[in-house]
């Protein structure tokens, strides 16, 4: 049995968010194919993920039984490390991802939990895991330099040791005359195919 962490990083409501329309469909199809797996939903806005404070940095520098017990945000790092698969639903906002997703990655990028330092430099501890990033974009931003959200997600996951990473992107949703319904439907179809093999 695998544990799937479904990370939702969008303040828009269910049914309104085009990203969530596709990511929720992905999860539905995944559950059909993998009924024995556990899916844990983590809505970053409902969790009130915040920016790191000075005391958080101090706790990161000295992780022991006391800091594990008294440092609330560390639970997210342990939760992330314990998952086998990650579904990250985050739209493109202003060429990147919502700031709350970056804040979340700051919570979970913890020495000794998700990566560590070796004589050769940092090494990710999250080996043999896989991820899919589902993103809706207003225009066509699939390539650099304007696209910085998906590239960041892939880079930070790679830093943590996750090497099997896919992207499901729904683009050109805000272009004048775009058939948004058809594009979302196309995104759902792609999501369904990826979910079967995920």
Curated annotation (Swiss-Prot):
Coiled coil (UniProt feature): none
Cofactor note: Binds 1 FMN per subunit.
Keywords: Flavoprotein, FMN, NAD, Oxidoreductase
InterPro entries (alphabetical): Flavodoxin_fold (IPR003680), Flavoprotein-like_sf (IPR029039), FMN-dep_NADH:Q_OxRdtase_AzoR1 (IPR050104), NADH:quinone_OxRdtase_FMN_depd (IPR023048)
Pfam families for the chain: Flavodoxin_2
EC number: 1.6.5.-, 1.7.1.17
GO molecular function, one term: electron transfer activity
Known catalytic reactions: 2 a quinone + NADH + H(+) = 2 a 1,4-benzosemiquinone + NAD(+); N,N-dimethyl-1,4-phenylenediamine + anthranilate + 2 NAD(+) = 2-(4-dimethylaminophenyl)diazenylbenzoate + 2 NADH + 2 H(+)
Keyword field contains Flavoprotein: yes
Cofactor(s) the record lists: FMN
Protein residues bound to FMN: 92-95
Function: Quinone reductase that provides resistance to thiol-specific stress caused by electrophilic quinones.
Subunit text: Homodimer.
Family membership: Belongs to the azoreductase type 1 family.
Protein name (record): FMN-dependent NADH:quinone oxidoreductase
